[in-house]
Amino acid sequence: MTRTFPGTVFSNREGVTLPENGCGITVGNFDGVHLGHREIVARLISLVQSRGLPAVALTFDPHPAELLHPGLARHFLTTTRRRAELLLSLGLDAVFVLNTTRELLNLSAEEFYSEVLCRRFRPAAIAEGEDFHFGHNRQGTLSDLQRWADRDSIALTAVTPVQIAGTAVSSSRIRVLLEEGNVADANDLLVFPYRVEGQVVEGQRRGKALGFPTANLGNVHTLVPHDGVYAGVATTASGARYGAAIHVGKNLTFSATERTIEVHLLGFTGDLYGQLLQVEFFQRLRSTEKFDGVEALREQLHADVVHVESLSRLNVGKPQTQGVSLSSTRFSG
C-alpha cells in the first residue's frame, strides 16, 4: 500500500502544479530564513532556470523537534506561514509544507528519498547545505543523497555554509543572539529584520496615562527577544508602518509580575484592539529598569521616543516582502 504524506502548498499564484518532468527542490526547516537559506535557494534557482522548471522548497509543520522532544521548551523564529512568505520572496515558485507525523519521522533516509522526494516531487535537481541530514534520527547524509541522486540522474548541488565573522550562519546562532537581546547582530544574519506578530490585547493603560499609549501584544508564537527597550517598526493590519519604541519584559516601576510586549507607535492615533500587529526589532536601546516615580519614567519614555525617531526614519518605508501575496492549498501527498 502506498503511503501518503499530506500537507499544504503555499504560493504567490493560484493553482500551482508540478510538471511531469519534475522540479528543483530544497528540503529543510528554514527557521528564520537566514543568509544560508538564501544562498541555497539562489543556487537551486540557477540550477533549474535554464531547464524551465519550477523551484520549490519542502518543509515541515510542526517543526520535527516538537514531536521528537515534546517536553523541551523551545521557541522558533518564524511561523509556518512566515517561513513560506520569506522563502517565496527569494524567488521560489512554491513552498510545500508536510504535516509532521510519527510515520513521516520514522521513515529511513532512503524511504524519505524514494517515497517523499522522488514519488511526490520527481526532482530534476536538488540543492542542500553541506551539513544536510534527513530520515529517521537524521541518519541520511549528503553523501547518501549524492549516491542516490547519481543513480537516478538527478543534479545535486551542495552549498557551503555562509559565514559571518568566521562562524557559520545558523538558526541556532540567531536564536542565541535574540535570547541575549542582540537583535542588530541577529538581523545581520537574517534575510529580513527579526519580526514578531500578535493580536493587540487589553493592557493596564498605564502608557496612555503617561502620554505614551502602547499596544500590548498577545498570542505571540515565536521567540521574543531578551527583556529590554528596543527601536523598531510596527505594521498595522492596514499595512501602515510606524516607528516603534518596544518594551519587552516586566514593568518594574509598577511592580508588575507578567512579562509583556508593549509597543508605542510614533505618530499613531486610533484603536488597535483585536487587530494583528507586526513588530520588527532593529536595535536594543537599554535594559528594563525600575524608576523612582512616574515623572522619572515619563522622562525616560520621552528620551526613548526621541532615540527611536532618530533611528527609524530610514526603516519605515516599504514593508518586508512587499508584493508576496500568499495563497494556500491542501495536497494529499
Regions found by a protein language model. Give the residues of each.
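A conserved beta-strand->alpha-helix junction
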Residues: L58-D61, L90, V95-E103, T160
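Phosphate/ribose-recognition catalytic cores of enzymes acting on nucleotide-derived substrates
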Residues: G203-G333
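Glycine-rich, highly charged phosphate/nucleotide-binding loops
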Residues: H75-R83, L107-Y113
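N-terminal catalytic cores of NTP/NDP-binding nucleotidyl/phosphoryl-transfer enzymes
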Residues: V16-T79
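Short acidic-hydrophobic, aromatic-tinged amphipathic segments that line or gate anion-handling sites
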Residues: T2-G15, F96
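A glycine-rich helix N-cap at a beta->alpha junction
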Residues: T79-V95
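Classical nucleotidyltransferase
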Residues: E103-P213, T288, D292-R298
